[in-house]
Regions:
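Alpha-helical transmembrane segments and their membrane-interface boundaries
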Residues: 1-121, 135-271, 277-354
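Conserved catalytic neighborhood of penicillin-recognizing serine enzymes
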Residues: 131
Length: 354
C-alpha cells in the first residue's frame, strides 16, 4: 500500500483518499516541525533532536488534540526523567539489575500500547526511555541539560499541537479508530516480544560505542510498534524506504545551499517543504508509522542533530542508510526468534491469521 501511495504522490491520485482534514494535518505537521527546528537552531540547544522529533511524533501519530492527549504526553516525559535518574544514577553499578529494570519498564509500556487506551503514554515512554538511556550512558552527557531539554521539548510539542489545532482546525470531527479486540495471550505475546527485543537493543548500545547512531537506534525501536513479527517486517520495509527518501532529500538540500546552511532564512523553507511532502505521504498512507512517518522522523533527527556544511554529506547519508538497514535486519532477526519462542507456549501464543 505504501509503495503505491509513494507513486501516487507525484501523480493525480483520484483513487487515493486525501480529505480536507488530511490537508490540515499535513500543514500542522510541516509548520510544527519548521517552528520547532527554528527554535532549537536559534537557541543552539544541545539536544535539538528532542525539540524537533517530539512535535513531529505527536502530530503525526495523533491527529487530534485534547486534555487526555496532553496529559499522557507530559506525564510520560516527566516519569521518564525520574526513572532515568534512578536507573542510570543508582543502578548502573549493578548492570544485571539495571537491565532487568529496563526490561520491566519496556514490557509495561508495550503493554500499554497493546491494550490501546494508553497507546500514546506507552509509545512516548518507549521513545523517551530509549533515547535518554542512550544519551545518559556516555560520560560527556550533562544530565541536567538532557532532562530539562526533554521536558522543555515535551511542553513545546504540546503547546504547538494546541496552537496549531486552534489555528488550523479540522473541517469535520474525526472518528475514533476501530478498537482491536485482543485476548490475554496476544497482549502478553506483544508486550514480551517487543520488551525483550528493545532490551537487547539497549544492551547492545551500552556495550558498543554507538553514540552517533541515533537513527539506527530509533529505527530498531520504531519497527517494534506493531508488536508482532509480520507487522515488524512490513514496518521495516517502510522504514528503509522512508529513510532513503529523507536522506536523498537532505542531500539535495545541503548541496543546493552548501555554503549557506547556517542561514535559517534559506534553510527553513526547504526543510518545511520536505516535511510537507513527507507529511502528505504520511496522511495518505493511513497506516500509522509508514514510509511518510519514517521520512518525517528522519528529517527531524538529522536536522535536529545540526548537520554542518563542511562534513562529507555523501558519506553521512550512506552511513545512516547503512546503519539503519543493519539495525533493521538485526532487529527483525530478534523479533522472529522471540516470535517463535513465545508461540511455543499457550499463555503467550499469537498466530496472525491471513
Amino acid at each position: 500500500m505504501s509503495i503505491n501511495t509513494l507513486a501516487h504522490v507525484f501523480t493525480p491520485h483520484g483513487n487515493i483518499v486525501y480529505t480536507a482534514n488530511d490537508f490540515r494535518q499535513t500543514v500542522r505537521i510541516a509548520v510544527a516541525g519548521t517552528i520547532a527546528l527554528s527554535i532549537s537552531t536559534f537557541y543552539d540547544v544541545q539536544y535539538g533532536v528532542f525539540f524537533v522529533v517530539y512535535p513531529l511524533m505527536l502530530m503525526s501519530l495523533v491527529p487530534v488534540f485534547n486534555r487526555h492527549v496532553a496529559r499522557q504526553f507530559v506525564f510520560s516525559a516527566a516519569v521518564n526523567c525520574v526513572e532515568m535518574v534512578l536507573i542510570v544514577g543508582y543502578l548502573s553499578q549493578w548492570p544485571v539489575i539495571m537491565t532487568l529494570v529496563v526490561f520491566a519498564l519496556y514490557v509495561m509500556r508495550f503493554r500499554f500500547m497493546s491494550q490501546g487506551p494508553l497507546f500514546l503514554l506507552g509509545s512516548m515512554g518507549v521513545v523517551c526511555q530509549s533515547t535518554m538511556l542512550n544519551f545518559m550512558s556516555y560520560p560527556t552527557s550533562n544530565w541536567h541539560t538532557l532532562m530539562f531539554s526533554n521536558m522543555e521539548a515535551c511542553v513545546l510539542a504540546v503547546a504547538l499541537s494546541a496552537l496549531l489545532h486552534y489555528l488550523i482546525p479540522d473541517v469535520e470531527p474525526r472518528k475514533p479508530p476501530p478498537r482491536i479486540e485482543k485476548d490475554a495471550a496476544r497482549i502478553r505475546h506483544e508486550s514480551l516480544l517487543s520488551g525483550t527485543v528493545a532490551t537487547i537493543i539497549f544492551v547492545v548500545f551500552q556495550i558498543c560505542d554507538l553514540s552517533d547512531l541515533l537513527s539506527a537506534l530509533m529505527a530498531g525501536i520504531l519497527i517494534l510498534f506493531p508488536m508482532h513479527y509480520r507487522g515488524a517486517v512490513i514496518s521495516s520495509i517502510w522504514r528503509v524506504a522512508g529513510v532513503v527518501l529523507a536522506c536523498l532529500y537532505i542531500l539535495v538540500v545541503q548541496l543546493i545551499i552548501y555554503d549557506f546552511s547556517n542561514h535559517m532564512i534559506l534553510m527553513m523553507p526547504l526543510i518545511g517543504l520536505g516535511l510537507a511532502f513527507s507529511a502528505r505521504l504520511h496522511v495518505m498512507e493511513k497506516v500509522g508509522a509508514g514510509v511518510g512517518f519514517a521520512s518525517i522522523t528522519t528529517i527531524g533527527i538529522m536536522f535536529g542533530q545540526n548537520l554542518h556544511p563542511y562534513q562529507d554529506l555523501v558519506f553521512s547519508d550512506l552511513y545512516r542508510i547503512t546503519s539503519v538497514t543493519v539495525s533493521l535486519v538485526v532487529t527483525l532477526t530478534l523479533v522472529f526468534l522471540m516470535h517463535r519462542l513465545l508461540n511455543c507456549f499457550a499463555a503467550t501464543r499469537f498466530v496472525v491469521s491471513d
